[in-house]
Design a protein with these regions (language model features):
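Short glycine-rich, flexible loops that bind phosphorylated cofactors or substrates
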Residues: 23, 162, 273-275
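Glycine/threonine-rich beta-strand-loop-alpha-helix active-site module
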Residues: 66-92
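Glycine-rich, small-residue loops and helix-cap segments
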Residues: 9-18, 58-59, 213, 236-298
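A short helix-breaking turn/cap at a secondary-structure junction
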Residues: 83-169
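Short helix-loop capping/hinge segments that flank enzyme active sites or metal/cofactor-binding pockets
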Residues: 147-152, 156, 198-256
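Gly/Ser-rich catalytic/binding loops embedded in alpha/beta enzyme cores
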Residues: 1-67
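Acyltransferase
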Residues: 2, 164-189, 212-217, 241, ...
Length: 298
């Protein structure tokens, strides 16, 4: 068992099984369909986890996110998906893609169930040096209580907004309007788009290293998308990688300034409804920034 599963078992959880993921948690899809419409994708990479919760096979499920692999499937399947702050949940024993970008997340149908499970797995783990100590002992009381203050939100309308389908854009704008004075619309800094490039460099470079033995020995059996990502990752140099990693701290500090005046950032979870067919699991672009920065998403 990986550390997360061990913690759940020791807390009395009944582990029902292993859900389907995309190949090595990348873009080559499995056979899982969307429980609301079997002609559509459930998203990826945590396809089976989102579908299992949405179809009432399980009240909660575990997934992982290196780009948009928890938030996007949750959106497509109509359940709650939570990707915590980097370092809150151990990745020990989980199939690795990128030590810098990998997060373990949780799916559920209610905030109460989400909190109930999360409090058991947010723990510092000496086997995963990225983890930190953080107390969540009072989380059940917090989720059941009303906010102690009037929350203020910020919405960044980035260049990615143009990729949102018309109906989703219309619905999200109506949602923003409904919040009224509780939300402020701000243009993202011009350097915002650079984050997507940096994330790709780290992601693909790390995959090229992590999966090198599979690529060298079993390339013919690997999916096309994974092979292409590994080959792109092998072309980046040390300077590219160092810049992408160092810039992460710079951008993180920039975003922390936002929270001097606002409590949360609002953004779409996906580019729209789940795409037709199973080959394409959808775009992760509305999660990329928060995964790169290690910021929590729900």
């Amino acid at each position: 068992d990986c550390e997360v599963v061990s913690l759940l078992r020791s807390s009395g959880a009944l582990v029902m099984g292993k859900t389907v993921t995309t190949e090595f948690a990348y873009f080559d899809a499995g056979k899982t369909t969307n429980p609301h419409d079997h002609t559509r994708t459930p998203g990826g990479s945590s396809s089976g986890s989102a579908a299992a919760v949405a179809s009432f096979m399980a009240p909660v499920a575990i997934g992982s996110q290196t780009n948009g692999s928890v938030i996007r499937p949750a959106s497509y399947c109509g359940v709650i998906g939570y990707k915590p702050t980097y370092g809150l949940i151990s990745r020990h024993g989980v199939m690795k893609q990128s030590n810098i970008l990998d997060h373990v997340g949780v799916f559920s149908r209610s905030i109460e169930d989400l909190a109930f499970v999360t409090k058991e797995i947010i723990k510092k783990d000496p086997q995963d040096k990225s983890t930190v100590s953080y107390s969540v002992s009072d989380i059940m009381n917090i989720v059941k209580s009303k906010p102690a203050f009037d929350p203020q939100f910020v919405f960044f309308k980035t260049t990615k907004w143009k990729n949102l389908d018309k109906e989703s854009a219309k619905s999200f704008e109506a949602f923003i309007k409904k919040l009224g004075s509780n939300v402020t619309v701000i243009d993202a800094p011009s350097t915002f788009d650079k984050i997507f490039e940096y994330h790709q460099i780290i992601h693909e470079s790390d995959m090229a290293y992590t999966f090198s033995h599979f690529y060298q020995r079993r390339k013919a059996k690997l999916g096309k998308k994974l092979v292409e990502a590994i080959e792109r990752g092998n072309k980046y140099n040390a300077r590219d990688y160092a810049e992408a990693c160092e810039s992460r701290d710079h951008f993180y500090e920039q975003f922390q300034e936002v929270f001097h005046d606002y409590h949360a950032i609002l953004t779409p979870a996906s580019t729209g409804v789940a795409p037709k067919g199973l080959e394409y699991t959808g775009s992760p672009e509305f999660s990329t920034v928060w995964t790169y920065l290690g910021m929590p998403s729900i």
